[in-house]
A protein has these predicted regions:
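N-terminal Sec-dependent signal peptide, specifically the hydrophobic helical h-region
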Residues: 1-34, 38-40, 45-63, 81-106, ...
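Solvent-exposed loop/turn motifs of extracellular immunoglobulin-like beta-sandwich domains
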Residues: 3-7, 36-41, 68-70, 78-90, ...
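Proline-enriched interdomain boundary motifs that mark the N-terminal boundary
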Residues: 21-30, 111-120, 218-227
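Short beta-strand segments of immunoglobulin-like
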Residues: 30-36, 118-124, 136, 227-232, ...
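Solvent-exposed loop segments of extracellular immunoglobulin-like
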Residues: 50-62, 137-152, 244-258
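Extracellular/luminal immunoglobulin-like beta-sandwich modules
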Residues: 88-111, 186-217, 287-308
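Extracellular juxtamembrane-to-transmembrane boundary of type I single-pass membrane glycoproteins
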Residues: 304-322, 336
Length: 337
C-alpha cells in the first residue's frame, strides 16, 4: 500500500472510531429521582462521560444553568417555590448527536393543610349514610391516599393515581357507612397520607383529622322477655320490671286497670310497677310500652293474685282454740273439787 493511501486509511479509521464513541447520548443525573417539600432547597448533579462537550446546563423556570466546556452541571436551588420547575439537563456536543436532554424526575409535595370529617348529625341503624373526608391544600394529588377508620378498623381507602395536577388541591372523599347497634358512639377518623415512593421522606407525610363520635339512633329493644307470668299471695308485695335499650333513651308507659295500691317508678332506664298488699283487684295483665321517635317495644306481664287463708278456716280455727281453752279450764276446776 502506498504511504499516502495508508495515511488516508488511518485517518478514516480514527474518524469512524471517534464518531462511534460520541454517537450516543450519555447524560447522568444524580440523584435520578428527587422528592422535595415545597420551599425546601434542592441540589442535583448532571454529567457525561463524553469528551466532545461544548456546553452543559439546566433548563428550568427557576435557576436555569449554562456552563460552557464543562462535563458537569449542577442545579442548585436554595428554596424551591414554584410548582412547574420541570428541570431538564442538556448537554451540547461537538459531534453527533449534537444535543442530549434528560428530564429530572422531580416530585414537589406539600402536606395537607387540614383534614376533617363531614358527617350527618346522626346515623340510623341499618341505613346507609355518608361520612366525607375533606383534605385541604395538598400536592401532588396522584400520591395521595385517603382512609377512613372506625376505631382501629379501616373502612375505606381512596387514591388519585390518575390525577396529574402538580398544584395543591382540595379533595372531598365520601365513604358509605351502614351502622349497627354496636356502632353507637363509635369514633371515626380520617387519615390523609402522601405515599411519595423512592426518595421520599420516611415515614410518609401523614395528617389525621380530629376524631368524631357518631350517634346511631334505633328503636327500643326489650332487655327481657316480652311475655311474663308472675304470681303473688293476696296481701303480699311484688315489683313488676320493664327495661329496654334504645337511642334516644326510651320513655315508658304502663297500661292497666287503675288501683289505689299501684305505684309507677322509672329510674336508671328501668321502669317498675310496685304493688304492696296485693288483692284480687290487682289480678290482671300489665302492659309496658317503651317508646322513642323510631318505634315502640311492648312487654306484657300477667299477674295472678293467689287467695290467702279462707275466712271460714280462720273462724273454725278460732272456735277450736276457744273450745280447747274452755275444756282445759273446766278440767282444772273439776279436779279442784
Amino acid at each position: 500500500m502506498e504511504p499516502g493511501a495508508l495515511l488516508v486509511f488511518v485517518g478514516l479509521l480514527f474518524f469512524n472510531s471517534e464518531s462511534a464513541s460520541s454517537a450516543v447520548c450519555d447524560v447522568n443525573i444524580d440523584p435520578s429521582r428527587v422528592v422535595v417539600r415545597f420551599g425546601d432547597p434542592v441540589i442535583v448533579n448532571c454529567s457525561t462521560t463524553r469528551e466532545d462537550v461544548f456546553e452543559a446546563g439546566w433548563e428550568s423556570s427557576i435557576n436555569p444553568v449554562n456552563e460552557p466546556n464543562s462535563k458537569i452541571t449542577v442545579w442548585n436551588v436554595s428554596s424551591l417555590i414554584v410548582w412547574d420547575a420541570e428541570p431538564k439537563c442538556f448537554i451540547n456536543y461537538m459531534n453527533e448527536p449534537r444535543q442530549c436532554v434528560e428530564k429530572l424526575d422531580l416530585v414537589i409535595y406539600k402536606s395537607p393543610e387540614s383534614v376533617s370529617l363531614i358527617a350527618p348529625e346522626f346515623m340510623k341503624i341499618g341505613v346507609e349514610s355518608t361520612i366525607t373526608c375533606q383534605v385541604l391544600d395538598v400536592a401532588p394529588a396522584r400520591y395521595l391516599s385517603v382512609k377512613l377508620y372506625k376505631g382501629d378498623e379501616q373502612l375505606g381507602n381512596r387514591s388519585f393515581t390518575h390525577d396529574s395536577t402538580r398544584f395543591p388541591v382540595n379533595e372531598s372523599v365520601p365513604f358509605p357507612v351502614t351502622p349497627t347497634r354496636a356502632d353507637n358512639g363509635a369514633e371515626y377518623t380520617c387519615v390523609a397520607e402522601l405515599q411519595l415512593g423512592p426518595g421520599g421522606p420516611k415515614p410518609n407525610p401523614t395528617k389525621r383529622s380530629p376524631p368524631l363520635k357518631m350517634p346511631v339512633v334505633y328503636k327500643p329493644s326489650l332487655l327481657s322477655a316480652a311475655e311474663e307470668n308472675v304470681e303473688v299471695r293476696e296481701g303480699g308485695s311484688i315489683v313488676l320490671k320493664c327495661s329496654a335499650d334504645g337511642n334516644p333513651a326510651p320513655k315508658y308507659e304502663w297500661k292497666y286497670r287503675i288501683a289505689d295500691n299501684v305505684q309507677e317508678i322509672t329510674k336508671d332506664g328501668v321502669s317498675t310497677v310496685n304493688i304492696p298488699r296485693a288483692s284480687s283487684s290487682n289480678d290482671r295483665v300489665y302492659e309496658c310500652h317503651a317508646k322513642n321517635r323510631y318505634g315502640v317495644a311492648t312487654k306484657n306481664i300477667t299477674l295472678t293474685v293467689k287467695g290467702g287463708t279462707p275466712w271460714i278456716m280462720i273462724i273454725l280455727l278460732i272456735i277450736g282454740v276457744v273450745l280447747a281453752i274452755a275444756i282445759i279450764v273446766g278440767g282444772i276446776k273439776f279436779c279442784g273439787r
